[in-house]
Amino acid sequence: MMSEPVRVAITGGSGRMGRTLIEAARQQPSILLGAAIERAGSTLIGVDAGELAGVGAMNVAITDSLDKVVDDFDILIDFTSPEASIVHTDWCARNGKAIVIGTTGFNHAQKEQISAYSESTPIVMAPNMAVGVNLMWKLLEVAAKVMGDYTDIEIIEGHHRYKKDAPSGTALKMGEVIAEALGRDLEKCAEYGREGITGERDRETIGFSTIRAGDLVGEHTAMFADIGERIEITHKASSRMTFANGAMRAASWLAEEDPGLYDMQQVLGLN
């Protein structure tokens, strides 16, 4: 017997990612779009979310308030900004809703706030919802343990010209995975870009390089380079749909979970 679909709401419904999330919800029979939210004052308030996303009417009008749709969904999917995500997570904690957070760029204090909310609220938070990226993190752990102490490690990432944070949350997570596997502290060994006369490279460092150009959806490479050979582990996303589908998968999984702070590794059973 088929279970009831998971009712979701999507914040930032008119944005590029918001429209992709609406499209993904439309495509998946296990998901039911219950609400789509935009900021107050938007000219799109009242527009059908499905028509906005180009997938046909879904009988869900864009609204400017979570309070107005509190009875229409069980899980909020949030790809907005760190400040907005904190507000939305607080609302979910007060109203008995779970939340999937795909926002990046949180500072340490904001991460601590979300962790505190998870004591009473089921939360999946991941800097990248793509299944392939989460598999890549597992491969990086293996590569770091085998080669990390004997190679120079560089992380190169590229995104579209509109992305606001750098390095990307995915790139930072790559660094965290590698550093943890090697017993290093990323805050102490990360090197963000180079300029001028830098001297010989310190093998203990993990380098980060950032590209912002055109309409790149997301490209990430970790390089383990020695004299005479190197290994590169790369993930390239060609569509935001890969992130949206991962978010829907996370929502379906989270519907059965108790309060806590989870990541996509747990959603996918990779831990």
Curated annotation (Swiss-Prot):
MF GO annotations: 4-hydroxy-tetrahydrodipicolinate reductase; NAD binding; NADP binding; oxidoreductase activity, acting on CH or CH2 groups, NAD or NADP as acceptor
Residues that hold (S)-2,3,4,5-tetrahydrodipicolinate according to the record: 160, 169-170
Pfam families from the UniProt entry: DapB_C, DapB_N
Subcellular location: Cytoplasm
InterPro entries named among the record's database cross-references: DapB_C, DapB_N, DapB_N_CS, DHDPR_bac, NAD(P)-bd_dom_sf
EC number: 1.17.1.8
NCBIfam families: dapB
Function noted in UniProt: Catalyzes the conversion of 4-hydroxy-tetrahydrodipicolinate (HTPA) to tetrahydrodipicolinate.
Protein known as: 4-hydroxy-tetrahydrodipicolinate reductase
Lineage: Bacteria, Pseudomonadati, Pseudomonadota, Gammaproteobacteria, Alteromonadales
